[in-house]
């Protein structure tokens, strides 16, 4: 059985397209002493996977952590609408990185990696930002946006894996199979 160590409906949807999965969110302290954003994303993904693996040692565990980085500043999940507005204003007209660290545990093997996707936002008007905030789609999303939803109209271009920006790179599934992890395909 594949267990997704996340409460993210986006990750559940992506992984669930390929495999029958169970969801068991990890309850970890999401602080990290890692020096770089990539190291932080990988560290948190690994912590999530290991926490869930301790409960389900005979299953395949998939975990991920996604962060948005603009000019070296990590833009996490906003705690308020005001904070979301500030993040969107910062991202307006700029290129930023979406970094997802992932970790897979199967039969004692621990495999992790990092994917980075560049995203360029068009210039966002104050009215557009206010409208987006009113949708409440910004809640619980790194960088205050979900590319798969209303915020898709913010994007001028993307370089890299679209699903990485959503929260789980397709590469995770490919790595899972390529490395000999043999979960049952979805019927």
UniProtKB/Swiss-Prot annotation:
One of its GO terms (cellular component) is cytoplasm. Gene3D superfamilies: 3.90.950.10. It is an enzyme of class 3 (hydrolase). It holds the Pfam family Maf. Keywords: Cytoplasm, Hydrolase, Nucleotide metabolism. Nucleoside triphosphate pyrophosphatase that hydrolyzes dTTP and UTP. May have a dual role in cell division arrest and in preventing the incorporation of modified nucleotides into cellular nucleic acids. This is dTTP/UTP pyrophosphatase. It comes from Pyrococcus abyssi (strain GE5 / Orsay).
């Amino acid at each position: 059985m594949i267990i997704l160590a996340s409460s993210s409906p986006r990750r559940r949807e992506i992984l669930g397209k390929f495999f029958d999965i169970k969801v068991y969110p990890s309850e970890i302290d999401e602080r990290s002493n890692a020096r770089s954003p990539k190291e932080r994303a990988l560290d948190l993904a690994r912590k999530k996977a290991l926490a869930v693996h301790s409960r389900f040692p005979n299953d395949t565990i998939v975990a991920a952590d996604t962060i948005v980085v603009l000019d070296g500043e990590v833009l996490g999940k906003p705690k308020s609408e005001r904070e979301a507005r500030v993040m969107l204003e910062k991202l307006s007209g700029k290129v930023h990185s979406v970094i997802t660290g992932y970790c897979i545990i199967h039969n004692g093997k621990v495999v992790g990696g990092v994917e980075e996707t560049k995203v360029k936002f068009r210039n966002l008007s104050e009215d557009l930002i206010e409208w987006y905030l009113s949708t409440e789609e910004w809640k619980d999303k790194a960088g205050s946006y979900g590319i798969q939803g209303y915020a898709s109209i913010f994007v001028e271009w993307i370089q890299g894996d679209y699903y990485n920006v959503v929260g789980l790179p397709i590469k995770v599934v490919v790595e899972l199979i390529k490395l000999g992890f043999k979960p049952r395909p979805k019927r």
